Amino acid sequence: MKKILLLLSFTIVGACSSNSEVSLPTENLNEVLACGDAKGLISKYGAKSVILDTSIVTGDDTLRGAIIFPGTAKQANVFFHEGKISDVSVQGESSVWKTASGLYLGLSLQEVEKINAKNFTISGFGWAHGGSVVSWEGGKLAGDSTLTHLVSFRNKRQNISIEEFKKVSGEAEFDVRHALIQQMNPALEQITILKPYIPTKEEGKGIAKKIESSQIPVR
């Protein structure tokens, strides 16, 4: 009887390990960025897997860009600047994509903190840009002139009371070491890797308008 129970235990552990391995992301999001342009996307992933010049809803914005592997776990959004791929993003609860730095959808805030090897700062929750990283505070995810990480965490209350949630909500910045944020420990819901560029004057005006329209009214 003991041998049977022991065998069952090994079987269950083995099955759990196998499922865990299968569920981990396997595709490198940085390789999409490295495609360079639309032709590069088609060359790497095939014309049937790429939809060019389409509308993409991301957060509270609707932008023009490309989608690869639409409607599948491999879906990723690709955006361009002057004909070149400028940024690539994934959003939702899960995806097969991960960044070369180790980020993937569903990863907890505390795990992201470990990857960054430092605390970082996020915006307060409960508004259009809630739960977004404001600064990596010089950590490993801070990026450089060639690559930057932009991420947002689940922008909803969890593991804390409504009154406690109000204390970490709104248009304010919070260190992720805040006790209530640590208690929430939200998961990544959006990841973007981008090549920094200087926007044109008109692009700058458009960005300013979007930011202004998303601000919380002062009461």
What are these regions (language model features)?
Residues 4-13:
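Sec-dependent N-terminal signal peptides
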Residues 16-129, 133-138, 143-147, 154-219:
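Short helix/turn-capping signatures at newly exposed starts of structured segments
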